[in-house]
Amino acid sequence: MVSEELLQRLKLLDEEAELRFDDDRRFRMIIVGGAALLLLDTISRATRDIDALDATAEIQTLLEKYDINMRVTAYMFHFPYNLEDRLVPVRLLTKKIDYYTASLEDIVVSKLYSERDTDRQDILSPEVLAAIDWDVLEHLVYDEDEAKANAYFEQEYQSLLYNYEEYRRRYRPCGN
């Protein structure tokens, strides 16, 4: 799935939610992973599904139909604690569902926890490297109230630190 297909799928989900819920309520969904990077225009590779970290309970029954994966909530501790403070609205006119992505820096932190090849490749894309706010990323990794506060195990946090320091050493532009 590429960006246009992804936006179309989100639009269709919103339309179905509008048919199912004929009141004034609005729902929310936070998109992470490769789909979020597509929506942030920082990768161009296709992605198979949409990973949602959070979605309003009422719409969760619709998500499977649109191949939206909520199983990533098991990895919530791979995101910095104050993720919600940095959500990026998806530019899509909707009637029922407000879509957001995690910030690029929050996604990079989550992918630095991962050992999967596709996650590593995602954060090495030239678009990601050019768009990262390295000061924000550094804050998310080292601040006691961010990645460390949400880490499930100290050993995993130490692994994140190691991966981040290697990533920073190799890819952060000089002078930053």
Indicate where each model-derived feature is located.
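Compositionally biased terminal segments of proteins
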Residues: 1-176
